Amino acid sequence: MADTVENAVSTPDVEQPWAELGLSADEYQRIREILGRRPTGGELAMYSVMWSEHCSYKSSKKYLRRFGDLPQQTPLGPLLAGIGDNAGVVDIGNGLAVTFKAESHNHPSYVEPHQGAATGVGGIVRDIMAMGARPVGVMNALAFGPLDAPDTARVLPGVVSGIADYGNCLGLPTIGGQTLFDPTYYGNPLVNALCVGVLRHEDLQFAKASGVGNLVVLFGAATGGDGIGGASILASESFAAEGESKRPSVQVGDPFMEKLLIECTLDLFNAGVVEALQDFGAAGISCATSELASAGDGGMHVELDRVPLRDPNLAPEEILMSESQERMAAVVRPDQLDRFMEICAHWGVAATVIGEVTDTGRLHIDWQGERIVDVDPRTVAHDGPVLDMPAARPWWIDELNEDDANALPRDNSGEGLAGALLALVGSAQLCDRSWITDQYDRFVRGNTVLAQPNDAGMIRIDDNLGIALSLDANGRQTTLNPYLGAQLALCEAYRNVAVSGATPVAVTDCLNYGSPYDPDVMWQFDETILGLVDGCRELGVPVTGGNVSLHNRTGDESIRPTPLVGVLGVIDDVHRRIPSAFAHDGDAVLLLGTTKCEFGGSVYEDVIHAGHLGGMPPMPDLNAEKALAAVMVEASKRGLLSSAHDLSDGGLAQALVESCLQGGLGVSVSLPEGEPSVMLFSETPARAIVSLCGNGYREFKELCQEHGVPTARIGEVIDHGEIEVNGLFSLPLDEIERAWRKPIPTAMGE
C-alpha cells in the first residue's frame, strides 16, 4: 500500500530511511519543517534525489554562481539562454541559434561501460532537444587509468562502443574529443559528452509549465526499473517489502527509440503544439515534474498510475525515481492534444496524458486515487541545501611546485632528441587515437567539415555558415595549480577553435573532481572557478552552462582535478576553414608565438622522467591568445593559409608529427635560437604552426605584426617522408608512424 499524505499526517513518528538515501539529519529535519509533517515515501524519494549532489549542486553551487557575474554576451550578441536552462543558446545571426552543453556520466560508465557511456550520450542529446533544437553533432572527452592496466582493457572498449553505437544509430557525427590516460583515473574513468544543436530563434523552448488546464504529456519509452538507486530502498524496505528487492542499476539506452523521439519532437515543434518541454534525465519524473512546475506560474497535478510501465511491479516511489531513458514531458493545450497524439502515433512514439497544470502553486501526485505527494515544487527543484564545505590549500602543493620540472635533465644531442620524439609519439598520452575514433561515424548527415584528428570539429549550418567546437582538459597541469590549469584548458580549447578559422564565442564546462568532503578538493574547485571566470572575462566569452561531477575517487584517492572546457566558435564561410594537415610541398612553415622553458605538467616531463610531476604549469597569456585568435580568423577570411595547428601537448615536435602524418608529407625545419629540447618539447601556450604558399607570406607576416604576434619562419613542407631538424636529426615518417599507431591496438590485444 502506498504511503499517502493522509497516512504521513497520522503517523508522524514512522522510521524513515533518510540516511540510506543520502540525506543528512539536518536535511531530513528541514524537509519535515517545509512540509509541516514527515514526508511520504514518494516525497522522501523526490527530495532525496533532487537534493543530491548530482541534481542540486549543493557543494558547488556557491562557487558556480560566479559564472553569473560574467557578461551574458558573446562576441555576436546576447545569450538567448544560459546557466539554469537545459543548455546554453547562442545567437549566430540570420535568425539562427546554436545550443550546446557538456555533461558527465562517469560512475555509471565504470559499473557498466557500454550502457553507462551510451546513456550519457542519450541524456545530453535530450537536453539539446529540450531547447527546441535539432541535434547536429556530438563530442566526448574520456579519461582512463594507465593504458596497460588490466581494467582499462575492460572499461575503454565498452565506453567507446557505447558512445559509437548510440551516436551512430542516432545519425549524429562524433566530430571530436579527447582521451587521457593517467593512474588517478584507474577505477574512476571520466566519460564526458557534449552535444550541439541548431534552431531558429522562434523555436526556442523553455521548461516552464504555464496555462491552467494545459495537459502534461509523457511521451517516449515506457518506464522500467533501470537507473533506480535510492528509491529501491524505499520500495523494498519500507513501502513495498513484499516486492522484489532491486539493486541500483545503470540505465539502459535504446538509440533507435531516441532517434524516433528526436524526429517526433521536431515535428511537434514545427506543428506548434508544444507549450513547454522537459527531458527526463537524472531523477526521472521527480525532476521533470518539479522543474516544470516550479518554473511555471501555477502548479501541477499528476496521476502517477497513468505512467506506462515496462515492469508492472514497480512501486510508486520507484516510478518517481526511475531513470529509464528516451522519455520527455510536454505541456500541451487541450485543443492541441489530438494533433500532438497524431504526430506521436506517426512516429510510433507512445504518448500518455499524466496530468495537468493547475493554479494551486503545489505539485500534487496521486497514486490509484490517493495523494502521495503534496509539495511546493520549488522546494524540491530549486531550494535544496547550499553547503559551505571546508576548503584549504593543500599542504603538499608547495613541495610539489618546488620540484621544478624545468630543472630536470634534458638531452640535447641529436640522438637524444630523436629518441625523445619517438618516446613521446609512442606514449599513451600522444599516440594515435584512431582505434577509438574510427568506431565513430564522423561524417554522417554530410555536414561535417572538420573532424578528428583536426584541432576542432566543424559542422556546416547552411551553405557557408559553420560552427566549430573543441573540448580540452589537462589534469596534470591543474594538479600543479588549479587556477592556471583551468585557464590553460580554456586557452587550448579557445585556440583550437581559432586555428580552424572560427571566432570563439562561448564556453561550456564539465568539472570533474574528488570528494567534496576533502578540503583539498574544494580548494582546487574554488581556484578552478576563479581561473575560469577570470579567463572567460578576459577572452570575452561567457560560460553558458555545464556540469559538475564530484565524488570521483577510488578508495581515499581522488582523481586529478579535471576541468573539461568546451569552446564554441562560428565561421562565416566553411570553405575558408583551416585544416591541421600539411597540404603542399614547398609551403613555408611558420612558428607563431613565443617559446619559453615550460615543462611543468608536460608530456615530456611525464614520459622522459617516468611519471614525474612538479613545478608550475605554463603561464597563460590571455592577451596573446586573443591576438593569435584574431590573426587566425582574419587569415582564414583572406584564405592565406594551407594549414594551422595549435601547440599544446608535446609542443612543437608533436604538432609537426601530426601535421606530417595527417598530410602524408614531410617537413624540414631549423629550430629558432635556444635550447633544442625547449624549442621542440616545451608546452608554452598561445602558439601555433602554420603553413602557407610563398606568395601569401608577406601579407600574413604583416597581419601578425599588426596584432603583435611573433613569427619565425622555421622551415618548409617537403615531399619525402621525413622530419628533418637541421643540424640535429632526421627521422623517417614510417618509423614515427609505427611508434605512434602501436600503443592502443597492442593494449587492446590486437
UniProtKB/Swiss-Prot annotation:
Entry function = Part of the phosphoribosylformylglycinamidine synthase complex involved in the purines biosynthetic pathway. Catalyzes the ATP-dependent conversion of formylglycinamide ribonucleotide (FGAR) and glutamine to yield formylglycinamidine ribonucleotide (FGAM) and glutamate. The FGAM synthase complex is composed of three subunits. PurQ produces an ammonia molecule by converting glutamine to glutamate. PurL transfers the ammonia molecule to FGAR to form FGAM in an ATP-dependent manner.
Subunit relationships: Monomer. Part of the FGAM synthase complex composed of 1 PurL, 1 PurQ and 2 PurS subunits.
Q: What is this protein called?
A: Phosphoribosylformylglycinamidine synthase subunit PurL
- Indicate which residues the UniProt annotation says bind Mg(2+) 1: 103, 547
Q: Entry's NCBIfam families?
A: FGAM_synth_II, PRK01213.1
**Residues that bind Mg(2+) 2:** 127, 279
Pfam families, per this entry? Answer: AIRS (PF00586), AIRS_C (PF02769), FGAR-AT_linker (PF18072)
What sort of enzyme, by top EC class, is this? ligase
